[in-house]
Amino acid sequence: MEHHSHQEHENHTSHGNHEHHHHGNFKSKFFISLIFAIPIIILSPMMGVKLPFQISFTGSDWIVLILATILFFYGGKPFLSGAKDEISTKKPGMMTLVALGISVAYIYSLYAFYMNNFSGSSTHTMDFFWELATLILIMLLGHWIEMNAVGNAGNALKKMAELLPNTAVKLIDNNQREEVKISDIHIDDIVEVRAGESIPTDGIIVRGETSIDESLVTGESKKVHKTHNDDVIGGSINGSGTVQVKVTATGENGYLSQVMGLVNQAQNDKSKAELLSDKVAGYLFYFAVSIGLISFIVWMLIQNNVDFALERLVTVLVIACPHALGLAIPLVTARSTSIGAHNGLIIKNRESVEIAQHIDYIMMDKTGTLTEGNFSVNHYESFTDELNNEEILSLFASLESNSNHPLATGIVDFAKGKNISYATPQEVNNIPGVGLEGTVDNKKLKIVNVSYLDKSNFDYNKEQFTNLAQQGNSISYLIHDRQVIGIIAQGDKIKESSKQMVSDLLSRNITPVMLTGDNKEVAQTVAEELGISDVHAQLMPEDKESIIQDYQSNGSKIMMVGDGINDAPSLIRADIGMAIGAGTDVAIESGDVILVKSNPSDIINFLSLSKNTMKKMVQNLWWGAGYNVIAVPLAAGILASIGLILSPAVGAILMSLSTIIVAINAFTLKLK
């Protein structure tokens, strides 16, 4: 199957003011400009000093003028056009500075040519054609290299888009196979995927079994065994067997497209630090122009040498690099959000990366976050002579049969495993923070937790409850006619990575807090095993939100980790909301960060990525600002008295290097 680049996702973010110039344009312009520049360099003296390889003959100055004019308008076009764009948006920056520099050099050289050839003056006026040629060449080469570096720092989205194949094998009538374009695939179509091929769309396996490599899509390092009715993600690699997949999502609704959309949006949103760097970069233009003009005036007063003074002005204009400052944060952001996406960490809100450095407490739901959420039934019992234990289990399963809560799934699966049939329930309603109610076989039933029994003054066996709860069971009761008629106790397994995650949080001076609707005994048992000392149990959904508010009222920064749907109010209330175990449903509204997998270690991965991201941002900001603070005065000739003078060509090299260093530094960002 062919692969394509999904062009609509390629230009996912704007890195500075020349994002509309492809690096290929700079490459071709550089080599064509080199053809015009070489004769200028050979025929024209540098700063009036003739170099050993240079020659001149009658009419050579006219050749230099013609070639320099072509070079100025052809090789200089990206900078002149860029300056026009910047000025039209009232945001003059690097392109305007470069355009000013080459324009001053070219216009003054025209004046020098006139003075030397038509004025009749006996004194020779030095031109800047040599400097103009080398300046344009270096700037084109620098931008070509820079665009490659910038592209490498932020092109992970393009790589994600390329994971999707261009075509797929679709099953049509009588099991005939037809290769069609991805755009011709629709929901409920059946596609066949052979070993080693990319899964073309999100879907469900309807035939066959295989192992799937999701590492490039969700960051899952191990191959995942998939069989009938299992979900597969478009872009993942089919490992060992041929499978037939029923399409469940196409185009923009697919997992990869949603991820790319979210990452694209996050990269284009500006954080506070980026807004500050943009503002400073904007001021830098006026700073450079001011220093350039001041240096020109000062050197004219000191030496009365227009050539030297003009060289200072041009060097200042080309050496100043607001671009390095402007790219300092966007490049790191592009790299960071892309790394996150490849590892199943979808960063929706850019500011969460900055806030993560100041988190004091991480509050977590127990079920599904710290524990597997796969509940096994350890005990069930009838409390009425009218129904035996199996009939009580059947009623539990009936009422829970339409729910996707982990407790409900555990009961239904257990009943199926024991071949116990159950009826279809009627009028089922959730009771928030309690359980649910409904009608089964004309019986009005409720499944509730122990908090409900206590608050409603129901009579129940408290000793039995305590014994089961201390074994780590979540306990539910069945009520009919205000009588407790049955009990079911379910055990959950703590995730292997939970204990390490809690240990890592404590080592970072972040306090883990458990918030759960489960009973206190179970919560305490899990908390003690994990080393969590701060536990809040038997909570209603609104209780979690109010607890977060209480902690925040003391000035603490809170990150909440929980279910993107059930814990939505808490995720929104927290300083950072992290929705865990979203799977392919990454379009969850609540949550600044979305964890595709239900792996607690991804919480630490996010904190590590955030820390490394901020470190790179600070490094780039210091470099971008520090470079300009040092380079601009040097270009102005502040150390000329000790012989340290920078030519425009050297200034251009330094300016290009400054941006390349920022891009390379961003590219070295790692998850851990």
UniProtKB/Swiss-Prot annotation:
Cellular location(s): Cell membrane
Primary enzyme class: translocase
UniProt-listed GO biological process terms: copper ion homeostasis
InterPro entries membership: ATPase_P-typ_cyto_dom_N (IPR023299), ATPase_P-typ_P_site (IPR018303), ATPase_P-typ_TM_dom_sf (IPR023298), ATPase_P-typ_transduc_dom_A_sf (IPR008250), HAD-like_sf (IPR036412), HAD_sf (IPR023214), P-typ_ATPase_IB (IPR027256), P_typ_ATPase (IPR001757)
Domain of life: Bacteria
Membrane topology per record: Multi-pass membrane protein
Region (Disordered): 1-22
Reported function: Involved in copper transport.
MF GO annotations: ATP binding; ATP hydrolysis activity; copper ion binding; P-type divalent copper transporter activity; P-type monovalent copper transporter activity
Any single Gene Ontology cellular-component annotation: plasma membrane
Biased composition regions of type Basic and acidic residues, renumbered to the chain: 1-17
The protein's name in its UniProt record: Probable copper-transporting P-type ATPase B
Gene3D superfamilies the UniProt entry points to: Calcium-transporting ATPase, cytoplasmic domain N (3.40.1110.10), Calcium-transporting ATPase, cytoplasmic transduction domain A (2.70.150.10), HAD superfamily/HAD-like (3.40.50.1000)
Family, similarity comment: Belongs to the cation transport ATPase (P-type) (TC 3.A.3) family. Type IB subfamily.
Gene: copB
Residues annotated to bind Mg(2+): 563, 567
Annotated TM spans: 30-50, 55-75, 93-113, 125-145, 282-302, 313-333, 621-643, 647-669
EC number: 7.2.2.8
Annotated keywords: ATP-binding, Cell membrane, Copper, Copper transport, Ion transport, Magnesium, Membrane, Metal-binding, Nucleotide-binding, Phosphoprotein, Translocase, Transmembrane, Transmembrane helix, Transport
A Pfam family this chain is assigned to: E1-E2_ATPase
UniProt catalytic activity: Cu(+)(in) + ATP + H2O = Cu(+)(out) + ADP + phosphate + H(+)
PROSITE patterns membership: ATPASE_E1_E2 (PS00154)
Active-site residue list: 365 (4-aspartylphosphate intermediate)
